[in-house]
């Protein structure tokens, strides 16, 4: 499965620290603790359930601007 590149959608970055200048980013927000995180697949990459990411894997340490805290 292809892996998301920086800028794939919604200001996505593979390393959340790279989003530090984004107005929506808050420290500690990661794909792996987002409500859209689906499941880990391999080597720190996993599925995102947001429709704009359904064709690619995202990095657990990544971030995008539709981040929503998991409950």
From Swiss-Prot:
Compositionally biased intervals (Basic and acidic residues): 1-13
An example molecular function term from Gene Ontology annotations: metal ion binding
Organism superkingdom: Bacteria
GO biological process per UniProt: aerobic electron transport chain
Signal sequence range: none
InterPro entries: High_potential_FeS_prot (IPR000170), HIPIP_sf (IPR036369)
Family indicated by similarity: Belongs to the high-potential iron-sulfur protein (HiPIP) family.
Subunit structure: Homodimer.
Miscellaneous note of the record: In E.halophila, two HiPIP isozymes are found.
Name recorded for this polypeptide: High-potential iron-sulfur protein isozyme 1
């Amino acid at each position: 499965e292809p892996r998301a590149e920086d800028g794939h959608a919604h200001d996505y970055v593979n390393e959340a620290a790279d989003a530090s200048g984004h107005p929506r980013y808050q420290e500690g927000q990661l794909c792996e603790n987002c409500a859209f995180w689906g499941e880990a697949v391999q080597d720190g990459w996993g599925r995102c359930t947001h429709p704009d990411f359904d064709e690619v894997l995202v990095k657990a340490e990544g971030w995008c601007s539709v981040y929503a805290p998991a409950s």
